[in-house]
């Protein structure tokens, strides 16, 4: 049985394609499966193939695979049914639907009537030594896609850090961060916002390598999330687990996919979390270590990919050959 991962707009830089495509395919291949990314050469797609359609796949491509006799899985990881017109027809056309979280499955069922199987995102960062030994200036880090800024109370965070913490450096890494800092600087100059110390903010352009370097250097990953948007509660825990695997204390917000990590992170008021960690460095370090252990056992690409493909084969009634 051949396993192929495909998107009509495949980009390894895109987290969903990297985690749910490249990383998962590699983990399956390492376990002896014939699994890889499908490019424009469809000559090997036949009745002995499962094609997993990732983000930005289109109905025509799913139909093409079905016409060639392949079994099809449509993978969803963004709750954008109101925006993405291809979501519903892709769900209806595919033999099976997979999602990144239980809550994403609830949304998929609501919008399409289709049941789904859950495959959480695996961690992709190498395991680093757990550390928590801040200096006088605490080094904070946020990372995420450009769209993630929509779910971040950024002005409030900047204001509260300056007012309630004082000695900090907050590095934020994403796409087009210069636009955000320019916009906010202008707003403060016009008196529309106040209390932001831009000298303590370090906005950097994202690369996979730079994110890894900054994770190794920071003290705390600070990533609160606004919960009043229906998209937030369907997200996976990929940023949280990569931060834990990088050996860092994580301060965030209680989301459905984060609940199981509550013993290893801080999911209440973020300023209180920073102060608690600074006052209890030994306890913070213990949370990181236990969180790493839990994540390594439950969220490796090897474990998740095997669980996923076993369930796919079971649901589709195919046999691995």
Question: PLM features: residue spans?
Answer:
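A charged, aromatic-enriched C-terminal amphipathic alpha-helix characteristic of glycosyltransferases
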Residues: 126, 279-313
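N-terminal pre-catalytic "stem/leader" segment of glycosyltransferase-like enzymes
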Residues: 1-57
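Extended catalytic core of nucleotide-activated donor transferases of GT-like folds
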Residues: 36-108
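Donor nucleotide-sugar binding/catalytic pocket of nucleotide-sugar-dependent glycosyltransferases
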Residues: 95-129
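Nucleotide-sugar-dependent
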Residues: 149-150, 202-214, 221-242, 252-262
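A short alpha->beta transition loop at the rim of the catalytic pocket in nucleotide-sugar-dependent
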Residues: 219, 247-248
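Conserved catalytic-core segment of nucleotide-activated headgroup transferases in glycan assembly
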Residues: 7, 11-27, 125-128, 133-217, ...
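C-terminal "capping" alpha-helix adjacent to the active site of nucleotide-linked donor transferases
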Residues: 266-286
């Amino acid at each position: 049985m051949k396993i192929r991962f495909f998107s009509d707009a495949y980009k390894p830089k895109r987290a969903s394609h990297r985690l749910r495509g490249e990383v998962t395919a590699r983990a399956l291949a390492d376990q002896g499966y014939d699994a890889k990314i499908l490019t424009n050469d469809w000559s090997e797609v036949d009745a002995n193939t499962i094609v997993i359609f990732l983000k930005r796949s289109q109905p025509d491509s799913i139909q093409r695979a079905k016409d060639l006799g392949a079994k099809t899985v449509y993978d969803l990881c963004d709750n954008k049914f109101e925006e993405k017109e291809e979501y519903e027809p892709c769900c209806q056309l595919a033999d099976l639907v997979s999602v990144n979280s239980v809550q994403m499955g609830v949304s998929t069922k609501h919008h399409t009537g289709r049941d789904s199987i859950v495959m959480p995102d695996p961690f992709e960062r190498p395991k680093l030594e757990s550390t928590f030994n801040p200096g006088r200036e605490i080094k904070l880090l946020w990372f995420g896609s450009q769209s993630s800024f929509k779910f971040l109370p950024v002005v409030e965070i900047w204001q509260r850090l300056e007012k309630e913490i004082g000695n900090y450096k907050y590095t934020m890494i994403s796409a087009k961060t210069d636009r955000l800092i320019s916009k906010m600087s202008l707003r403060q100059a016009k008196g529309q916002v106040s209390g932001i110390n831009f000298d303590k903010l370090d906005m950097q352009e994202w690369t996979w390598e730079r994110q890894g370097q900054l994770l190794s250097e920071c003290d705390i990953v600070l990533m609160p999330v606004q919960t009043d948007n229906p998209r937030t509660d369907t997200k996976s825990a990929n940023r949280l687990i990569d931060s834990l695997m990088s050996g860092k204390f994580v301060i965030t917000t209680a989301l459905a996919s984060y609940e199981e990590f509550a013993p290893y992170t801080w999911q209440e008021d973020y300023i209180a979390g920073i102060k608690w960690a600074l006052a209890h460095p030994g306890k913070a370090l213990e949370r990181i270590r236990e969180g790493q252990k839990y994540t390594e056992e439950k969220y490796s690409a090897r474990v998740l990919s095997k669980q996923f493909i076993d369930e796919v084969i079971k649901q589709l009634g195919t046999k691995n050959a």
